[in-house]
């Protein structure tokens, strides 16, 4: 989708600070971090939100997040994975993406 920000990042039209890439998934640093370490993981196949993804795409994403967090010292102290869905869920970019936050003590939801 030519008007999709994340599709343009995947295509190399917009630069990103890549931290992970395989055949199906791209991970990069969030431009506006909400934690000491804040990354976005996206599937290279466009979908609007998590409800449009099939089980293979979900497995691809979570396998990538698992590999990344295990290899980058996030697993031991903990991290959070979040996906916002649609307007009321806080989604602002309509290409399914998962936020991976860590590197510090995170606040509890609702705090």
Show the residue positions of the predicted features.
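HIT superfamily nucleotide-processing domains
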Residues: 1-111
């Amino acid at each position: 989708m030519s008007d999709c920000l994340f599709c343009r990042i995947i295509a190399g039209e917009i630069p990103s600070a890549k931290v992970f890439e395989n055949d199906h998934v791209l991970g990069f640093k969030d431009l506006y971090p909400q934690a000491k370490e804040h990354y976005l993981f996206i599937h290279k196949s466009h979908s609007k939100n998590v409800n449009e993804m099939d089980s293979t795409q979900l497995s691809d994403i979570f396998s990538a997040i698992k590999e990344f967090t295990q290899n980058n010292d996030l697993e031991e102290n903990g991290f959070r994975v979040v996906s916002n869905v649609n307007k009321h869920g806080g989604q602002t970019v309509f290409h399914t993406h998962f936020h991976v936050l860590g590197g510090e003590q995170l606040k509890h939801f609702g705090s």
